[in-house]
């Protein structure tokens, strides 16, 4: 699995990436329409704050979805994520929430990526982009 460094501080925030140039989360946040641009900017700022301070305890900004899966919230934008040891936060992707419930396919996709991450971690097959020396 490939990870791209999003922000680093007391916590380290990564996003799942297909390659150094292709990160679903950053492409999503950079490609939202004009009406959601402020929310996208706020989400990127939130990810920076999370790296410095840890995930917010305010459930209007971050809360548990199911099991070990959480979501960050900014307006209608959502970013799903999970923890790993040593204060790592792995973001699996983002989407625009259109209804009351988080879409099942987004949750399933995030759980698949989480399973892949921990499986690849056991095999020492995690490639990290964006850190010095990589």
Give the residues covered by each predicted segment.
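Basic, Lys/Arg-enriched alpha-helical interface segments
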Residues: 1-76, 86-89, 96-134
């Amino acid at each position: 699995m490939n990870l791209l460094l999003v922000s680093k501080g007391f916590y380290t925030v990564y996003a799942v990436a297909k390659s150094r140039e292709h990160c679903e989360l950053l492409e999503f946040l950079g490609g939202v329409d004009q009406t959601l641009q402020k929310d996208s900017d706020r989400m990127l700022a939130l990810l920076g704050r999370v790296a410095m301070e840890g995930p917010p305890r305010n459930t209007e900004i971050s809360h548990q979805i199911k099991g070990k899966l959480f979501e960050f919230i900014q307006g209608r934008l959502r970013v799903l994520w999970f923890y790993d040891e040593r204060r790592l936060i792995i973001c699996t992707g983002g989407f625009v929430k259109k209804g009351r419930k988080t879409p099942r396919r987004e949750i399933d996709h995030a759980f698949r990526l989480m399973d892949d991450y921990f499986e690849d971690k056991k095999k020492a097959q995690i490639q990290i982009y964006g850190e010095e020396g990589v």
